[in-house]
């Protein structure tokens, strides 16, 4: 029997940098649809993903309307105070077997193209650890603020994207260990790394950027 592929979209945040404190950014409209709907639909484009589980904050009254009519989609009020807590809760809520594959995708990455998603799944299914979409750093990188302290060597540096795809058992254990240790987990791959694994880097796509700042909304609309 083929192991299941389950996607998790943590959508319990508010997006404080996006310029609309009255509306969480995942519900802001892009080309006429909530950003969250675009992100979930991008995952549903690959038939190998059996289910997309969206984790929202308890009491969230917007998610139902934003996701109405989408197939293979489950919305659960299991969002936590941090991304790691939300993903861990969604993973527990899914009852996924340890051998199932979990793809975690940002609600703020609505521009995920089908070919990048397929590339990630193909690569990870053939890998012992799993991996993530990422892009090699192209710009010169400076450290400092407000003045330059140093120019960093960009050779070998990658910008992490999502989805990030790992076996449920491995991810569950890595997140639990990271939370118990009190460290900051900014993405699933960092928890996997802390557990001693080396995730695979799979080339992503420029249009799969994370909508973060007010100007990003206009830019993303050009892609959708």
From Swiss-Prot:
Transition state stabilizer, annotated site positions: 17, 25
One GO term (biological process): isopentenyl diphosphate biosynthetic process, methylerythritol 4-phosphate pathway
InterPro entries: IspD (IPR001228), IspD/TarI (IPR034683), IspD/TarI_cytidylyltransf_bact (IPR050088), ISPD_synthase_CS (IPR018294), Nucleotide-diphossugar_trans (IPR029044)
Keywords: Isoprene biosynthesis, Nucleotidyltransferase, Transferase
Taxonomy, superkingdom: Bacteria
Molecular function terms from GO: 2-C-methyl-D-erythritol 4-phosphate cytidylyltransferase activity
Name this protein carries in UniProt: 2-C-methyl-D-erythritol 4-phosphate cytidylyltransferase
Record organism: Bordetella petrii (strain ATCC BAA-461 / DSM 12804 / CCUG 43448)
Gene it is expressed from: ispD
